[in-house]
Amino acid sequence: MTQLPYLLDRRGGALAAPATAWGDMMLNRALFSVALLSSVGSAWVVLSYACIKELRSYRHQLILGLAISDLLMSLNFMFSAGWNVAGGDLALEESRTACSVNGFLTQVFVVQTDWWILVIAIATYIILGNFKTQSQFIQTHVWIPWVGPWVLSIIIAAICHGVLGYGYIGGWCWLTSDLMRLLINFIPRWLIVIAIALIYIRLYMIVRKARKWDIEGVSPDPGDDMADTSVILMSVGKKDRERQGSGVLVSRDVSVSFGRKGSTAPTFVTMVTTSGAGDSREAISSCSAREEGSRARTVNVNSSRSLSLGMRQPLNAAQLKRIAKKMMVYPVAYAIIWACPTAIRIYQGTTGSRAPLWITIVDKSCIVIQGLVDAVVYGLNERAWQGWRDHIRRIIYKNEGGRIIG
């Protein structure tokens, strides 16, 4: 009896691929939908950077690099899944070239997003950790963090293509051996997750100590290694966010520096700037409500770009706690979405058995959804929403005679 096409046995392929053509079709339909969501999330981050000047800080330039990689990876997944949904089959010999290209791009962008995540964490630590020389260097040589992820990922993908080759694994083409994918991609990714966890734990401790000083009014010991640490609440942007003539400038950078001076007074920051066209000066403000002897607790605002005119930012415990919690979201998010794929690689690589279809769909969806997760972690925040609201207002309203009118 002739088997129906959608029931054809495909167990001769990679373990990661479904055993039947019907299962493969279900997998590809699910992955195409997830990849579409990821591409929308990544495009949101890219579009936000392009349209909103407030989201063009140095750190956002690195996030842009991650978003571009996520977007390209999502489009690559949409291509492979769409190819199979439309009636093609990347597992066939005649599709070998397309499969090799798809596998190469998959390897490039999976590795690349790993390195982008690490680069962002390291850059954040350098800036928040008050490493002034290193911070100035990386911010004046923006191209260096951009080159690293691209060069490393392309080299690794090229070596894998030459030594192992790429084949269809269900949904897309990649390294067909679960054990090889585990060794080349998953173990390095977990090392990166551990590294960024350690980095953000250190930053969490920095912010937590700052919060403790703010609550208790306790200044750091002169010998404390935290004494010269700066906690940046807002990033430095390339251009001022300015409404001409209205005197409204929104804060760009707030650096809370706990020096070797202290007091028991609540801390706040006063930000000043000039509002003349093309005029930007360094704003430095120190506030202290009370002094004890020769020790005074100061909060310094240092920025080469304009800050809010006469605007005060209370640095209360809730703010510092929120910042500390947000830092820990990054490693936790990546650990969650990669836990299932890693477990499946270990299971299939050691037992040689194929996982059930529904587990395969969940497994691959966790990989494809990374673009959406990155968009939520890095791109969906109050600052982005406020930036979009202001951007829409600028489109709706005209600026005439130095004042905004309807």
From Swiss-Prot:
Alphabetized UniProt keyword annotations: Cell membrane, Disulfide bond, G-protein coupled receptor, Membrane, Receptor, Transducer, Transmembrane, Transmembrane helix
Extracellular side: 1-29, 83-107, 165-185, 348-356
Effect of a null allele: Decreases cAMP levels following exposure to C.elegans. Decreases trap formation following exposure to C.elegans ascarosides ascr#3 and ascr#7.
Bilayer-spanning residue ranges: 30-50, 62-82, 108-128, 144-164, 186-206, 327-347, 357-377
Location relative to the cell: Cell membrane
GO BP terms in the entry: adenylate cyclase-activating G protein-coupled receptor signaling pathway; cell surface receptor signaling pathway
Main localization category: membrane
Topology with respect to the bilayer: Multi-pass membrane protein
Domain of life: Eukaryota
Induction: Induced following nematode exposure.
GO molecular function: G protein-coupled receptor activity
Pfam families, per the entry: Git3 (PF11710), GPR_Gpa2_C (PF11970)
Matching PROSITE patterns: G_PROTEIN_RECEP_F1_2 (PS50262), G_PROTEIN_RECEP_F2_4 (PS50261)
Cellular component terms per the entry's GO annotation: plasma membrane
Keyword Cell wall biogenesis/degradation found: no
InterPro entries documented for this protein: GCR1-cAMP_receptor, Glucose_rcpt_Git3_N, GPCR_2-like_7TM, GPCR_Rhodpsn_7TM, GPR1_C
Subunit structure, as described in the record: Interacts with ascaroside receptor GPR3; may form a functional heterodimer. Interacts with guanine nucleotide-binding protein alpha GPA2; to activate adenylate cyclase and positively regulate nematode trap formation.
Protein family: Belongs to the G-protein coupled receptor 1 family.
Functional description taken from the UniProt entry: G protein-coupled receptor that senses nematode ascaroside pheromones and signals via adenylate cyclase to positively regulate trap formation for nematode capture.
Protein name per Swiss-Prot or TrEMBL: Ascaroside receptor GPR2
Organism: Arthrobotrys oligospora (strain ATCC 24927 / CBS 115.81 / DSM 1491)
Lineage: Eukaryota, Fungi, Dikarya, Ascomycota, Pezizomycotina
Gene that produces this protein: GPR2
